[in-house]
UniProtKB/Swiss-Prot annotation:
Region feature Mediates interaction with CCNT1, mapped onto this chain: 286-314
Name listed for the protein in its UniProt record: Protein HEXIM1
Biased composition (Basic residues): 148-163
Effect of residue 332 to A: Loss of oligomerization
Organism: Homo sapiens
Protein function: Transcriptional regulator which functions as a general RNA polymerase II transcription inhibitor. Core component of the 7SK RNP complex: in cooperation with 7SK snRNA sequesters P-TEFb in a large inactive 7SK snRNP complex preventing RNA polymerase II phosphorylation and subsequent transcriptional elongation. May also regulate NF-kappa-B, ESR1, NR3C1 and CIITA-dependent transcriptional activity.
Residue span of region Autoinhibitory acidic region: 210-250
Induction statement: Up-regulated by HMBA (hexamethylene bisacetamide) (at protein level). Down-regulated by estrogen.
GO cellular component, one term: 7SK snRNP
């Protein structure tokens, strides 16, 4: 019975030497009791070979061989030439594995070339899929793994790299140097553009803002001394001039006439703006009330003005006395100026002999 089994086994199609390694392998357990059937899932078509009927077993319900008479699974590793076949045939042709068949024990079978090909080791197994090398390429594979494990060389930053610093963190000296450098660069670029005939825009700087800011406040002390000195007559004395100069300079704020006018104008503008805003925010009743208050204030000021006019008329006789005092003051100033000129002449005459004696 071994010869028909081997002949049918040899006629099965062979795709490669590793077809048996890809399928699920399972060795027969020698301790399994005889006659035990191996249950195979019906859903998996790989385990049901309908194209090739089973040999050496009883016919099934559909005319095929029973599950007991399946050929032994192929081994993934190399087996001896005759031991694999004998172990696979034990469950089918042995006396203790067949339930109802009276088959004699198989005779010794000579190894065929097909059986030797099936018994060769598989080189395309999972080990080769994971990248395991063959026996001859172990060194090359190890070298590739070492190269992959090496870290890439990372270049260090250049030591000559300029560290940038924000402008607001610079010191005063650093800001000054930076501004000078930028101005020189802008001037150079403008000169190059002008030489090429291209239109040149003015240097973009904020200095004009500072100039406008400085011009907002008037020059309070420019030309005050010369104008006041030219307006003074020759009959004034040095003491009177110093006193008048102190009055012209203003109070403790040190601002002259132009400064006081500027402050007065600024105050009036601010007051008008505030008054306008307050009137716009008032309701109609509040505006009527404010108008009545202003009329009362106007009538009161008119009464005060009339009273002061009457008093000035009563004191009209004192105006002549005031004029006489003003004339007397002018005469005394003229005498004082004459005395000053005479004193200066006497000093010059006293210095002349001393200069001759020194020579």
């Amino acid at each position: 019975m071994a010869e028909p089994f081997l002949s049918e086994y040899q006629h099965q199609p062979q795709t490669s030497n590793c077809t048996g390694a890809a399928a699920v392998q399972e060795e027969l357990n020698p301790e399994r009791p005889p006659g035990a059937e191996e249950r195979v899932p019906e859903e998996d078509s790989r385990w049901q070979s309908r194209a090739f009927p089973q040999l050496g077993g009883r016919p099934g319900p559909e005319g095929e061989g029973s599950l007991e008479s399946q050929p032994p699974p192929l081994q993934t590793q190399a087996c001896p030439e005759s031991s694999c076949l004998r172990e696979g045939e034990k469950g089918q042709n042995g006396d203790d594995s067949s339930a109802g068949g009276d088959f004699p024990p198989p005779a010794e079978v000579e190894p065929t070339p097909e059986a030797e090909l099936l018994a060769q080791p598989c080189h395309d197994s999972e080990a080769s899929k994971l990248g395991a090398p063959a026996a001859g390429g172990e060194e090359e594979w190890g070298q590739q793994q070492r190269q992959l494990g090496k870290k890439k060389h990372r270049r260090r930053p250049s030591k000559k790299k300029r560290h940038w610093k924000p402008y607001y963190k610079l010191t005063w000296e650093e800001k000054k140097k930076f501004d000078e450098k930028q101005s020189l660069r802008a001037s150079r670029i403008r000169a190059e553009m002008f030489a090429k005939g291209q239109p040149v825009a003015p240097y973009n700087t904020t200095q004009f803002l500072m100039d406008d800011h400085d011009q907002e406040e008037p020059d309070l002390k420019t030309g005050l001394y010369s104008k006041r000195a030219a307006a003074k007559s020759d009959d004034t004395s040095d003491d009177d001039f110093m006193e008048e100069g102190g009055e012209e300079d203003g109070g403790s704020d040190g601002m002259g006439g132009d400064g006081s006018e500027f402050l007065q104008r600024d105050f009036s503008e601010t007051y008008e703006r505030y008054h306008t805003e307050s009137l716009q925010n008032m309701s109609k009743q509040e505006l009527i009330k404010e108008y009545l208050e202003l009329e009362k204030c106007l009538s009161r000021m008119e009464d005060e003005n009339n009273r002061l006019r009457l008093e000035s008329k009563r004191l009209g006789g004192d105006d002549a006395r005031v004029r006489e005092l003003e004339l007397e003051l002018d005469r005394l100033r003229a005498e004082n100026l004459q005395l000053l000129t005479e004193n200066e002449l006497h000093r010059q005459q006293e210095r002349a002999p001393l200069s001759k004696f020194g020579d």
